[in-house]
Design a protein with these regions (language model features):
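Short N-terminal strand-loop motif that marks the start
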Residues: 1-64, 138-146, 150-152
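Nucleotide donor/acceptor-binding cores
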Residues: 3, 81, 186-187, 211
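Glycine-rich beta-strand-centered segment in the early N-terminal region that forms part
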Residues: 23-37, 50-97, 102, 153-157
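Active-site-adjacent beta-strand anchor residues
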Residues: 33, 60, 86, 166, ...
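NAD(P)H dinucleotide-binding glycine-rich loop of Rossmann-like/cofactor-binding domains
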Residues: 94-192
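Adenosine-nucleotide cofactor-binding segment
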Residues: 188-194, 203-243
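N-terminal Rossmann-fold NAD(P) dinucleotide-binding loop
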Residues: 198-199
Length: 243
């Protein structure tokens, strides 16, 4: 099918909106019409070749949208479902079998190399192969092919175009607090940097019952937002000694 995608063709270059051809979903794949996508530093790292993803490539790994088609083996979602797309894991290595997909042994190959695990590309333009499958999605496009494993169904009463960051930034910040730190009620939490990940960590601190949540940043607008989200103290290290 023909879609429009933001194609990155060179290191540090611009995103170019181009018409490309996207495969039909394979038996374990899900075709999603993208409603919204977050822009993460990891996308910019791939653009700048801090991670060696191949060009030309369609980036984007915080996508959300509506399922349009599914492969015959897909059971978790159906056409019309609202979904958030996240990273993809192999599902077969030791960590994956223990439910720890976030440390999948094949994570780099599955998320950064621009192709399906079998090496095939999902997109092309004329006779040119376009690398995709970035984090198992490449959501800087009107449509994305994802795997059933990295497609998460969400309620349809929430604006789907706002949910993309759940796939990376929000789960990174909130998950780091809830699952890794696991703070007890009444404990203190310091968050250095209050971008999307840091703000998510603050929200998780509130959820966990932290009595003191300290936000540290050099931008006054972010510190103001951090207070609104639950930070009890804010520090701008340019204006005061954070120690």
């Amino acid at each position: 099918m023909k879609i429009r995608a933001a194609v990155m063709r060179e290191k540090g270059g611009p995103f170019r909106i181009e018409e490309v051809e996207l495969d039909e979903p394979r038996e374990d794949e899900v075709l999603v019409r993208i409603a919204g996508a977050g822009l993460c530093h990891t996308d910019l790292a791939a653009r700048d070749q801090l991670v060696p993803s191949p060009f030309p490539i369609v980036l984007g790994h915080e996508g959300s949208g509506i399922v349009e088609k599914i492969g015959k083996r897909v059971q978790k979602v159906k056409p019309g479902d609202h979904v958030v797309l996240s990273y993809v894991a192999c599902g077969a290595c030791g960590p994956c079998r223990k439910g720890m997909e976030h440390i999948c042994l094949n994570s780099f190959e599955y998320n950064f190399m621009g192709a399906r695990p079998d090496g095939s590309r999902t997109m092309r333009k004329g006779g040119e192969k376009i690398n995709g499958s970035f984090f198992g999605q490449s959501s800087f496009a009107t449509h994305a092919l994802a795997n059933e494993r990295n497609t998460v169904k969400v309620d349809d009463d929430v604006p789907i175009e706002r949910l993309g960051p759940l796939g990376c930034g929000i789960q990174t910040g909130a998950g780091g607090v809830i699952n890794a730190l696991s703070p007890k009620p009444g404990s203190s939490l310091a968050v250095f940097g209050t971008g999307g990940v840091g703000m998510s960590a603050i929200l998780a601190g509130v959820l966990c019952g932290c009595s003191r949540i300290i936000a540290v940043d050099v931008k006054e607008t972010r510190l103001k937002a951090a207070r609104e989200l639950g930070a009890t103290h804010v520090i701008d290290p340019r204006r005061s000694d954070p120690i």
